[in-house]
């Protein structure tokens, strides 16, 4: 295919529509399974600063895993878009923290400290066998990862239905170190 940008846009739209069509019961089951994998396979996260996200448009819901890691001693943070062309800023989050409406109507912590995460749990629209992700197309996570002097551990989270043979990564795309789906955990090139 000549125009990979158009292909990526088409795949993005299809994958989001498919994800949003999943029943609430199935979504909860898959999310719980992913949370179980995260809690069991990444025990080290209990002592780390974890950048998570607030679920949007049918994404895996990390809130139960967030609560588990927070209760285990981890410091949690949610991303905030401060400028369309700059890296994300992560603000400390805990249960019952005051929230405000951020970019794309996604809640963000209000008035909390900025945190530089040791690990990022990253939402995925699509992913491939090499750990590259297809995101929403704005490049926030790629800019954020490129800005860190020491990159954090990256864990993409998705449903198996979001797996693609190849996302046709662009030059600036950064592969994730792990991807966790309801089928299991995958490291590096899988």
Regions flagged by a language model, labelled:
Residues 84-190:
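Conserved phosphate- and dinucleotide-binding cores of soluble alpha/beta proteins
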Residues 1-116:
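N-terminal active-site beta-alpha-beta segment that forms phosphate/nucleotide-binding
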